[in-house]
């Protein structure tokens, strides 16, 4: 029996033997594709190739692509663990043809791999196929060439209520590449309920789809017209877990070797004995998606991809607690996961320490969140009047505190309270709508600027070149010429202008000819060509014309210094903070650099100083900035890091700075690190959960910044009649003096307030024989208010005191109740009622409670509410 790892390798070996380039799985975070939440299909990394915007040095490819479906249209999360085949994480085996072979070879390759004794050796009589209703070509290949009997070939028409809306017709979007597909099904046998595809019983588990072969042969226009593509392509996908279940003779994916091992390990860790428990399935599935998402740079957070990751982790942890887990357990599955994934586990193994750390921290945080959620639930239940907890509160517990609905229901049942689940479902649906990420490529394929060929980039060595115009675009449309005053995009055959990429801004400058000036404001890539974006201020330009392309050399130079400094900063961060630091984004301009990176903890001032010092040491070392072109495997073997947001071909540009930094980079750089001159960090802060940002400047900009800081220091010293060297000491003296004066003033205020205590006793109001004092005393701290309340309680003997004070734009509330009245009047209940009026909350003992608030303008209302409540309850 083949293991899952052996099946994965045999698939790649088979297609390699058929002339396919074996391409590594891409990240679960799609590169430069904001339309996708996660990589969810094998073709995602080849999207631009299919669109004609990218070229590869091969026309046939095969991959074992890791995928996640837990958001947007492809959302399997709620079914995971409860069905035989739903997963958040799965591997998609695929073979691809980019204008090379088409239907005949694609179908024959699939049949050979599935049925040949040399490969999988599946019984031919167990295989059924579907084709699009009008795809006679595919039908005839299956029937006449391959030999599949007509009774096992099913034509599927437009079964989704629209033209070309069919299980057997695939489209990239509303417009663009599309075409029919053929699907291969495996018949598990009549001992399992279900019917063949297209039948009323097709949702059963007898006939399982194992392979989908898509034939991209049309381009759909905006008006619905289908035009044939000049170079049709093939995109296929086969779920590794599904084919493993078939070959390992089991009916559920959770019974294959990978899941059996993960389930057994989970049971061992949490102390479970029933290996069929669905919670074990949930955890075994979720450790795969969570570990790979973190390895690919996703960090748990409250938005976007991080929010989906957090939901998956918490769902797994919750199921662990259902199984009886008493301590953190989820992260302990990572070593087992790495082992069972074999070669496909290397990316997690490389980040194992960070993966385990983040999983453990998130699980521990969830435990604390559960406690806070219980407190909120207790408070909400105390206010329920009609025996029903609102669905909005239940959803807040779920969404904000990660509180499972069934746990909320258990607590409610103990108090004979039910939940308005319909309202909860409405809130959940509204949240799904807000968070849903479109799974289609939300662009009009036909509106993209597309130009055949490519622009030769000469900017590594030149800032000025003669070049021929190959295309012009005005108002998004291709034109033959433009006139003065028009803004346009100019495509050149060759150019010294750098197009924005890898965080580095595009070059600016101008294009000139006799009597012609085109100001270039930005440079962007459109597929393989460079677009010079700007305005023609003089003359006219036409396709085929030669121009002199001149880059703004000063702006380019300053940008190059900042880009090289970014590499030094990245290396310094990894050396000072740890190898878990990876780039999450950057912006390199001529004025400054911005660098976002993964870092779960705050950076201390000492660490920040160490980082800045280390970068400046490497600048003074004056390392040569060396570039080498090599294949991707050699670059990785050399230890080169890939930069976030960049795409790399088989040949890559490796940038080395001494023995300190080595990265893959296509950007413009300084010749030596010494050219940077000076590196100065301006700000450092968190921009998202687990993501921090450093902004810095270099060269003359850094020197100018230091001069300005010196000027500010000198002016400050002059104002304080000090000098720069003793400025801190002088400020400290002033602060000490100010604190002393403020303390004396506060003491005088408190003394005056205490002296007024006897007046408060005299002015106490009697409510049903109980003495009540409600007063606003501004400028008094909470501590002093407490002392006053205690003193007045003693003077009254029996009574209620409620004080409000405004201090530094904030509200302090203190309520005291003598012991003889606490059965009827509770200080905590009254102070919370007052706090609600001033935007705050609080609590305490029945005889003494405090609260704070942020709305001083509502203090009078808080006093009135207290008086009304006491009138009602005494």
Curated annotation (Swiss-Prot):
Give UniProt keywords alphabetically.
Aminoacyl-tRNA synthetase, ATP-binding, Cytoplasm, Ligase, Metal-binding, Nucleotide-binding, Protein biosynthesis, RNA-binding, tRNA-binding, Zinc
Keyword DNA damage listed? The answer is no
EC? 6.1.1.7
Q: What would be an example GO MF term here?
A: ATP binding
Where does it live in the cell? Cytoplasm
Q: Which residues form a coiled coil?
A: none
Q: Name one Pfam family in it.
A: tRNA_SAD
Q: Which InterPro entries match?
A: aa-tRNA-synth_II/BPL/LPL, Ala-tRNA-lgiase_IIc, Ala-tRNA-ligase_IIc_anticod-bd, Ala-tRNA-synth_IIc_core, Ala-tRNA-synth_IIc_N, Ala-tRNA_ligase, Ala_tRNA_ligase_euk/bac, DHHA1_dom
Q: Which cofactor does it need?
A: Zn(2+)
Function per UniProt: Catalyzes the attachment of alanine to tRNA(Ala) in a two-step reaction: alanine is first activated by ATP to form Ala-AMP and then transferred to the acceptor end of tRNA(Ala). Also edits incorrectly charged Ser-tRNA(Ala) and Gly-tRNA(Ala) via its editing domain.
Give the protein family.
Belongs to the class-II aminoacyl-tRNA synthetase family.
**This protein's name:** Alanine--tRNA ligase
Query: Taxonomy-wise, where does this protein's organism fall, top ranks first?
Result: Bacteria, Pseudomonadati, Pseudomonadota, Gammaproteobacteria, Pasteurellales
């Amino acid at each position: 029996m083949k293991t899952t790892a052996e099946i994965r390798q045999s698939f790649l070996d088979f297609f390699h033997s058929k002339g396919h380039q074996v391409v590594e799985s891409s990240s679960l975070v799609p590169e430069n594709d904001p339309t996708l939440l996660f990589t969810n299909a094998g073709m995602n990394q080849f999207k631009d190739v299919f669109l004609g915007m990218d070229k590869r040095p091969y026309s046939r490819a095969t991959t074992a692509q890791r995928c996640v479906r837990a958001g947007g249209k492809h959302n399997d999360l709620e079914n995971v663990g409860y069905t035989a085949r739903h997963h958040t994480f799965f591997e998609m085996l695929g073979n691809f043809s980019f204008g090379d072979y088409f239907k005949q070879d694609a179908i024959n390759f699939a049949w050979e791999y599935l049925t040949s004794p040399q490969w999988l050796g599946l019984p031919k009589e167990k295989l059924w196929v579907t084709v699009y209703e009008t795809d006679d070509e595919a039908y005839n290949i299956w029937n006449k060439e391959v030999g599949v009997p007509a009774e096992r070939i099913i034509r599927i028409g437009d079964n989704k209520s629209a033209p070309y809306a069919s299980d057997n017709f695939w489209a990239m979007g509303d417009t663009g590449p599309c075409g029919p597909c053929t699907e291969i099904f495996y018949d598990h046998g009549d001992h399992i309920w279900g019917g063949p595809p297209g039948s009323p019983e097709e949702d059963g588990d007898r006939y399982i789809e194992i392979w989908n072969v898509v034939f991209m042969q049309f381009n759909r226009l905006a008006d619905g017209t289908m035009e044939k593509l000049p170079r049709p392509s093939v995109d296929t996908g086969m779920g590794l877990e599904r084919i493993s279940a078939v070959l390992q003779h089991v009916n559920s994916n959770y019974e294959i070797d990978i899941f059996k091992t993960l389930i057994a390990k989970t049971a061992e860790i949490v102390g479970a004995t029933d290996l069929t428990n669905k919670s074990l399935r949930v955890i075994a599935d979720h450790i795969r998606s969570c570990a790979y998402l973190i390895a690919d740079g996703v960090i748990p957070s409250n938005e976007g991809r991080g929010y989906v990751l957090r939901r998956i982790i918490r769902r797994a942890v919750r199921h662990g607690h259902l199984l009886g887990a008493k301590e953190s357990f989820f992260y302990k599955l990572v070593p087992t996961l790495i082992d069972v994934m074999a070669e496909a586990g290397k990316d997690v193994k490389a980040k194992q320490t960070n993966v385990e750390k983040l999983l453990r921290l998130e699980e521990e945080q969830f435990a604390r969140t559960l406690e806070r959620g219980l407190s909120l639930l207790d408070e909400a239940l105390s206010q329920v009047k009609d025996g029903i907890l609102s669905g909005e509160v239940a959803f807040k517990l779920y969404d904000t505190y990660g509180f499972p609905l069934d746990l909320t229901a258990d607590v409610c049942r103990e108090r004979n309270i039910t939940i308005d689940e319909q309202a909860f479902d409405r809130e959940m649906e509204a949240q799904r709508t807000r968070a849903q990420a479109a799974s289609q490529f939300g662009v009009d394929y036909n509106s993209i600027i597309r130009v055949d060929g490519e622009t030769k980039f000469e900017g590594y060595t030149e800032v000025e070149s003669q070049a021929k115009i190959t295309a012009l675009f005005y108002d998004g449309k291709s034109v033959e010429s433009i006139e003065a005053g028009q803004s346009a995009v100019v495509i050149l055959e060759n150019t010294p202008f750098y197009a924005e990429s890898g965080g580095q801004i595009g070059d600016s400058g101008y294009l000139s000819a006799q009597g012609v000036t085109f100001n270039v404001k930005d440079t962007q890539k459109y597929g393989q060509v460079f677009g010079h974006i700007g305005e023609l201020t003089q003359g006219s330009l036409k396709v085929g014309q030669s121009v002199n392309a001149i880059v703004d050399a000063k702006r380019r130079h300053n940008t190059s210094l900042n880009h090289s400094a970014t590499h030094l900063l990245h290396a310094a961060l990894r050396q000072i903070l740890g190898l878990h630091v990876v780039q999450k984004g950057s912006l390199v301009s001529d004025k400054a650099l911005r660098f976002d990176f993964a870092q779960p903890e705050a950076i201390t001032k000492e660490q920040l100083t160490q980082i800045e010092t280390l970068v400046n040491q490497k600048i003074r070392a004056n390392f040569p900035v060396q570039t080498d072109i090599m294949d991707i495997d050699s670059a990785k073997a050399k230890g080169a890091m890939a930069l976030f947001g960049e795409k790399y071909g088989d040949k890559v540009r490796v940038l080395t700075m001494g023995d300190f930094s080595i990265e893959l980079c296509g950007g413009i750089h300084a010749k030596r690190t010494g050219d940077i001159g000076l590196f100065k960090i301006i700000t450092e802060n968190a921009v998202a959960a687990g993501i921090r940002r450093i902004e810095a400047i270099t060269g003359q900009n850094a020197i100018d910044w230091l001069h300005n800081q010196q000027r500010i220091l000198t002016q400050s010293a002059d104002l304080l009649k000090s000098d720069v060297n003793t400025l801190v000491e002088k400020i400290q003296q002033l602060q000490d003096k100010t604190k002393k004066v403020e303390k004396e003033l506060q003491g005088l205020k408190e003394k005056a307030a205490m002296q007024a205590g006897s007046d408060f006793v005299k002015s106490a109001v009697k409510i049903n024989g109980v003495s009540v004092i409600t007063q606003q005393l501004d400028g008094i701290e909470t501590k002093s208010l407490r002392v006053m309340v205690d003193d007045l309680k003693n003077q009254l003997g029996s009574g209620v005191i409620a004080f409000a004070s405004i201090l530094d734009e904030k509200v302090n509330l203190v309520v005291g109740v003598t012991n003889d009245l606490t059965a009827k009047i509770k200080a905590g209940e009254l102070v919370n009622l007052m706090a609600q009026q001033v935007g705050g909350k609080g609590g305490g003992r029945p005889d003494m409670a405090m609260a704070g608030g942020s709305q001083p303008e509502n203090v009078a209302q808080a006093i009135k509410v207290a008086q009304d409540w006491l009138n009602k309850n005494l």
